Amino acid sequence: MWKEFKEFAMKGNVIDLAIGVVIGGAFGKIVTSLVNDIIMPVVGSLVGKVDFSNLYINLSGQQFNSLQEAQAAGAATINYGLFLNNLINFLIIAFSIFIVIKQINKLKNFTKKKEEVKVEATEKDCPYCYTKIDIKATRCPHCTSVLEEATN
C-alpha cells in the first residue's frame, strides 16, 4: 500500500496540483493586500474618504462607531463593505486566472500547429466514375477506365 501511495504522490499531476495550491494561496494573499491596502483606499478617497472595510448595516438598533465595536458587542450586522472588498478581490483573481489560462491555451495551440505533420494524399478521385482510388493507380478498379496520368 505504501508503494502505491508513493507512486500516486510522485506522479506529475499530484505534484503540479500541490505546487498550484501553494502558489495560489500566496497569490491570493498578494491580491487581498492589493485590494485592501492599495485599491480600496484610493476608491474610498475618491468617493469621500470612505473606509469600505468599515461599511455595514446595523441590525441591532444600537449605535456603534465602527464595525469592530458592533462585532465586539455581538450585534447583528450586514457587512457590505467587506463584501465589496472580497468581490473586488475575487474579480482580480478571476481575471488573472483568465489571462493565464488564455496564454496557456495560446501556447498549446502554437505547439500543436508545429507538431502537425503534413499528411500526403493517398487517394484521388477517378475522373470518370468519381470514386476514390489509390493515387498511383493507372486504371480505375471500379469503372476500368484507363487514367491518363498517375499523379504523385
Swiss-Prot record:
Which SUPFAM superfamilies does this chain map to?
Answer: Gated mechanosensitive channel
Gene Ontology CC entries for this record: plasma membrane
Keyword Electron transport set for record: no
Give the species this sequence originates from.
Clostridium perfringens (strain ATCC 13124 / DSM 756 / JCM 1290 / NCIMB 6125 / NCTC 8237 / Type A)
InterPro entries this protein is in?
A: Mechanosensitive_channel_CS, MS_channel, MSC/AndL, MscL_channel
Q: What name does UniProt use for this protein?
A: Large-conductance mechanosensitive channel
Similarity annotation: Belongs to the MscL family.
The subcellular location is: Cell membrane
